[in-house]
Amino acid sequence: MNYTASDITEFFQKYESKVTHNLVAHTKFRPYNHSKAQIDAMANESKKALRYALNCFGKSLYPNHSNYITRKPEIYRPLTLATIENINETTDEEQTIHFNISLGNLPKHLTTTHIEILFRHAWHVKAQQSNDIYITHVNDYPAETKKWFSYILKDTNKSKSLAWETSGTWDVLNCWIPHNAINTD
């Protein structure tokens, strides 16, 4: 069975109430004037960078217990729903490959500004990606969460295969659902 944009949206919406922050993180990669094979390689490098940044970010959430997210990820690792955008050939030289990420299960004492500082350090300094990051608390986002999910999956609505291809929009390997933390509410 091939996934559709609706299937992915439905999956994301199961965890909508647990999402506290939405984040856009641009990479250093620009698909302009590159072949599909080159763009796929850039996307794979981007996904590796995101995996590394998410691990660094997760550890920074618990500075006195940085091993929490590796020893007990089902409780302490942040909820992460990720999509990747601009992984197609383009004539727009300004476009970058970037991630749209919904986060949850973050320590409640952290402000949006503090979360941004921690993620920016992990993404820009540690993973050596672009400093172009935008983060907002879901209560401050100008639209409801359902519209955010529609926005981050807009490429799958334009090109159906992006919903189910392994090099498609949904970055499954960088998604994480901390079931024990979610079920303890």
Model-derived features with residue positions:
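Right-hand nucleic-acid polymerase module
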Residues: M1-I97, N105-D185
